[in-house]
Amino acid sequence: MKNGKYLILCVDDDGDILEALRLRLNKAGYLTETALSAEEGLKKFKENQPDLIIADLMMEEIDSGTGLVKELKLAGNRAPVLLLSSLGDSLTVSASTRELGLDAVFQKPVNFEAMLKTIRAKLGQKG
């Protein structure tokens, strides 16, 4: 938490999606850090210690979003992690969620209101 606001790290190799997430999350009252790669996301995680992380499943580096989640765990992450996916059926996504210890997986295009509800719940907020 910085300046009384929760900090959310968003990691996606699509700049348009990152900007949309940043704008929507800022409007909802959250501070955001963004990263265009898994490697940059890991660096920003170490620098900022965010309260929650949102990452894309399909990124080029560190074996995509799942690799990032594994690297975050090795770096001591205890923040909730939400994964964004444009691939896979619910069974595959469900298996990945259990295996990686993810807090939630959202299919693209993301229903932002549903994601916001999950973010609030994971951060222990009401509303």
Predicted regions and their residues:
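Hydrophobic/aromatic residues positioned on beta-strands within the core alpha/beta folds
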Residues: 84-85
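Conserved sequence signature across two-component system core domains
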Residues: 11-12, 35, 53
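Helix N-cap/capping motif at the beta->alpha junctions
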Residues: 34-43, 64-65
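Alpha4 helix (beta4-alpha4-beta5 surface) of REC/receiver domains from two-component response regulators
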Residues: 63-67, 74, 88-106, 114-117
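Conserved acidic segment of CheY-like receiver
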Residues: 5-16, 21-25
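Non-catalytic signal-transmission and effector/linker regions of two-component phosphorelay proteins
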Residues: 1-7, 113-127
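Active-site residues of response regulator receiver
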Residues: 56-57
